[in-house]
UniProtKB/Swiss-Prot annotation:
Catalyzes the transfer of a geranylgeranyl moiety from geranylgeranyl diphosphate to both cysteines of Rab proteins with the C-terminal sequence -CCXX, CXXX, -XCCX and -XCXC, such as RABA1A, RABA2A, RABF2A and RABG2. Involved in the geranylgeranylation of RABA2A. In vitro, can prenylate PGGTI targets with the C-terminal sequence Cys-aliphatic-aliphatic-X (CaaX) with leucine in the terminal position. Substrates with the C-terminal sequence -CSIL such as ARAC11/ROP1 or GG2/AGG2 are prenylated independently of REP and when the beta subunit is associated with the alpha subunit RGTA1. GO terms for biological process: auxin export across the plasma membrane; embryo development ending in seed dormancy; embryo sac development; endosperm development; pollen development; pollen tube guidance; pollen-stigma interaction; protein geranylgeranylation. The modification N-acetylserine is found at residue 2. It comes from Arabidopsis thaliana (Mouse-ear cress). Binds 1 zinc ion per subunit. Disruption phenotype: Pleiotropic effects on plant growth and development, including dwarf size, aberrant root development, multiple inflorescence stems and small siliques mostly sterile. Impaired shoot gravitropism and photomorphogenesis. The double mutant plants rgtb1 and rgtb2 are male sterile, due to shrunken pollen with abnormal exine structure, and strong disorganization of the endoplasmic reticulum membranes. Belongs to the protein prenyltransferase subunit beta family. Zn(2+) binds at residues 232, 234, 284. Its cofactor is Zn(2+); Mg(2+). PANTHER family: GERANYLGERANYL TRANSFERASE TYPE BETA SUBUNIT, GERANYLGERANYL TRANSFERASE TYPE-2 SUBUNIT BETA 1-RELATED. This is Geranylgeranyl transferase type-2 subunit beta 1. InterPro entries: PGGT1B-like, Prenyltrans, Ptb1, Terpenoid_cyclase/PrenylTrfase. One of its GO terms (cellular component) is Rab-protein geranylgeranyltransferase complex. Keywords: Acetylation, Magnesium, Metal-binding, Prenyltransferase, Repeat, Transferase, Zinc. The lineage of its organism: Eukaryota, Viridiplantae, Streptophyta, Embryophyta, Tracheophyta.
Amino acid sequence: MSSTSSSQMVQLVADKHVRYILMAEKKKESFESVVMDHLRMNGAYWGLTTLDLLDKLGCVSEEEVISWLMTCQHESGGFAGNTGHDPHILYTLSAVQILALFDKINILDIGKVSSYVAKLQNEDGSFSGDMWGEIDTRFSYIAICCLSILKCLDKINVEKAVKYIVSCKNLDGGFGCTPGAESHAGQIFCCVGALAITGSLHHVDKDSLGWWLCERQLKAGGLNGRPEKLADVCYSWWVLSSLIMIDRVHWIDKAKLVKFILDCQDLDNGGISDRPEDAVDIFHTYFGVAGLSLLEYPGVKVIDPAYALPVDVVNRIIFTK
Ligand code: GRG
Ligand code: ZN
């Protein structure tokens, strides 16, 4: 990455991003907070993971986070986006990921949480997001990632789950949200991630998928999510993590992507936006920092492309008893 360190290149303003994340948490009356209230659990996961990648998780009160998190658990075992809301598989994964960051998985009634997730599997192997039944390969990934962290994959039919994901594969090598749906980088991350976690990557046509994914890089260096769309920092996560999982990351220009991400920073107040000059938000701050982690940017911890958690956390949770 020698060209990334040329003199005119802006640097990662890590301390400002840390301050931005800590402030975003405090500003409960802000417009962003009101709009995001129902998905606070997901926002907390993005913010806390970013802090951990920057080695600053110690700046938040673990006790405060965990006591709030536990108020979001529903009697079914699933977690809601905030206190008093309905449970959903996405917030359940976020809650489990946050507890993983703090090495506190064991405070959970693991049997109850894993049963909530397992009950969302359908006869054809697919997963619904909650009791209302929407089906999407996002939920297949979420279920598999969550149950893998909880070491409860045996509670679902993994073979059928994999078969359903493979039925969402397209001729271009990509994956969609349901069988026959158009390939999209976000869904590709979900399908490739779920296949990686279950040891099923042999179902992926790595060359055609790698080709489709590397075509997402535009002239300015940023990546888009499908043909004809604008580049967006979040695809530095969805596309790059997928390329890494299929060993094709060397097919894109990494230095140009680093520059695109760094150009999306608010150098004064911290935070990262979707593209240069747009307003920053907590999601794109995570995607930018996580993207830089995948690009081996100095000073950022290494993130696992399948679990979306720092590698040291994954090693602690998954690879120890
Ligand atoms: C733990 C990393 C992690 C994820 C949890 C929620 C989830 C599982 C995955 C979501 C995957 C997904 C579908 C991401 C895409 C989000 C997105 C930017 C959608 C908008 O796509 P388009 O194509 O619009 O409608 P753009 O903005 O690309 O022009
Ligand atoms: Zn985006």
